[in-house]
Structure formats: structure tokens, C-alpha cells
């Protein structure tokens, strides 16, 4: 891959996503409580703590779960903050260590009596109690299975990072769908809505076409928006931008433009497949698909409302679309005070 340019222009993904964005009226209360909860565990060193605060994960939940009641929104905030912990810890680990971290998360989620005393296990147990209070049995079973797939793919991501390997597009897409945790976040929609879809719904062709299109839209949009941040940290191999540039031998700008075309395609597949959904699947299946659309548009809106991806220039980037690439960051001295517990 040739040297990167000094800047590139983002695709205008908002213009090709006609879905309606919203925010949750319970956001401030749920966000404050969830942030206090995660902060009480003192998980991060100074730079990561600042990054966590600036990212405003709870604001993302306000957009993508704009229809949730207070208790459900608080639970989603807790989960997204928990995912941030898993992601930040595993990003600096070897494949073996990342798999061990993931296993702590899975075991704490899966088994009521399992506990290794780590902060990660405690965080996961706290979330588990909130989630199980309202989630249906089929939703819980699928959620736990997705937790296992997520952690396996996070471990695979760490192994690829160790070796410096960049996957081809066909191999990368299923990995990204899982290690992004988007499917886990979609699974929370059933919990929020108080529905418990039959497994057969997840085998329906039109349902799956809409489901995967929504997932890929979130993943690809996230990757092009986060590319500058990730390349500055040396973590851009787990990003569709890098994968496409490597496989197609294209420039950063041409790749960004292509992602814009693909995201527009994902939107159309989602909308068309949603319309084709058979009424025989029941109103809950249609409601679920309608609700994951909030993830597609809400993810776009949130990305420009915080400094997570674009730093202090986030409003300017929203206006111009121009991203000025940052230099590589120096590694932070020291590590989280509880790194031995993860």
C-alpha cells in the first residue's frame, strides 16, 4: 500500500440514509448513572479515561435507542460502556491474552455462579442482572451465543494484529460483523421492545437481507469515520478501508468514495427487504427491523457530535467532510491499574 495522503474526504452518508434520527429524552439521567457506574471501577489510565469521556458512548445509545424507556436505555448504556472496556483492554493484548479477556466476559455473562474476582467479571455481572430482568429466553440464548462469537472474533483480531496480516474482503466481512459488536447491540433491541423473536425469524431471507444490510452499513460507516483515529494508533488493519485499499490497490480517497456507494446500496437493500417481509412472521419481526434502522442513521449523527473520531474538529468535518490525517501517537506510559485482573 502506498503512503497515505495528508487528508481525504468522507462520503456523505447522511444524504443517502433517509431514515429519521432521534434522541432519547431519558439520555441525561441514564448517561450520568451509567458513567458513574463504569467510573466507580477505575478501569482506565489517564489517556484512556479522557478518550472514554470524550467518546460519549451514552449519547450513541440515545440516538440508536431513541425509543427506549429509561430502564432499558440505562441498560444499553451500561452494555456499550462494558464493550468499551473489553475493546480497549483487548486492543493492547496478544491473541492469547485477548481470548482470555473475552472468556472472562463470556463466562461472567453465561454462568450465574461463575466469578474470577476481576473488575471485568464484576462489570459483566452487573450488566447481566439488568439484562436478564426483562429479556426473553430466546433473546437471552441468542445474546449469549453472540457474546461467544464476539469474543472469538476479538481474539482473532488480536492475532491478526500481532502478525500484521490484513484479510481479504470476503474473510473480513464476517469477522467485522462479529468483532464490531453490532450484532450484540442489535440483540438489545428485542430486550428494549419487550419482544422475543422465534428462531425461525432469523432464518427468513428478507429478514436476514435487511439485518445484514443494516449491520454492514453500521460497520462500514464506522470504519471510514474512525479510520484516521485508528491509523494514528496503528490499529487500522481491522478496518474495511485498509482491507479494500490492500485488495483493490486503490487510494484512500477512491476507497472512501466506494464505501459511500456501498453504504447507499446497504440502505436500499435494508429498505427493500423490510418492505418484502412476510406478514406471517408477525408484527414483532417488522418492529425489530424498523428499530435497527435507528442504528443506521443514529450512528452517523452521533459520529459528528463527539470528538471520538474527529477530535475538536468534529463539527468542521461534518460541514466539509475533510479529514486531515493525524501523525502516529506515541504509546502511553504505564497501563491501567487493574491490567493484571483482565
Swiss-Prot record:
Positions of (2E,6E)-farnesyl diphosphate binding: 308-309
Amino acids binding Mg(2+) 1: 87
Locate the motif DDXXD motif.
Answer: 87-91
Q: What Pfam families is this protein classified in?
A: Terpene_syn_C_2 (PF19086)
Residues bound to Mg(2+) 2 are 87
Q: Which reaction does it catalyse?
A: (2E,6E)-farnesyl diphosphate = delta-cadinene + diphosphate; (2E,6E)-farnesyl diphosphate = gamma-muurolene + diphosphate; (2E,6E)-farnesyl diphosphate = beta-copaene + diphosphate; (2E)-geranyl diphosphate = beta-myrcene + diphosphate
Binding residues for Mg(2+) 3, per the UniProt record? 222, 226, 230
Spell out the molecular function terms from Gene Ontology: metal ion binding; myrcene synthase activity
Record's keyword terms, sorted: Lyase, Magnesium, Metal-binding
Coiled-coil annotated residue ranges, if any: none
Q: What cofactor does this one take?
A: Mg(2+)
Q: Where is this site: Plays a critical role in the stabilization of intermediate cation?
A: 84
Specify the domain of life of the species encoding this protein.
Answer: Eukaryota
Q: Which GO terms describe its biological process?
A: isoprenoid biosynthetic process
Q: Does the keyword Transferase apply?
A: no
Any idea of its EC number? 4.2.3.-, 4.2.3.126, 4.2.3.127, 4.2.3.15
Query: Per the record's keyword annotation, is Lyase included, yes or no?
Result: yes
Its UniProt domain note says:
The DDXXD motif is important for the catalytic activity, presumably through binding to Mg(2+).
The record's similarity note reads: Belongs to the terpene synthase family.
| Protein function | Terpene cyclase that catalyzes the cyclization of farnesyl diphosphate (FPP) to various sesquiterpenes, including beta-copaene, alpha-cubebene, cadina-1(6),4-diene, gamma-muurolene, delta-cadinene, epizonarene, epicubenol and cubenol. Agr4 is also able to use the monoterpene precursor geranyl diphosphate (GPP) as substrates to synthesize the monoterpene beta-myrcene. Delta-cadinene is the major product of Agr4.
The name this protein carries in UniProt is Bifunctional terpene synthase Agr4
Task: Identify the species of origin.
Answer: Cyclocybe aegerita
What gene makes this protein?
Agr4
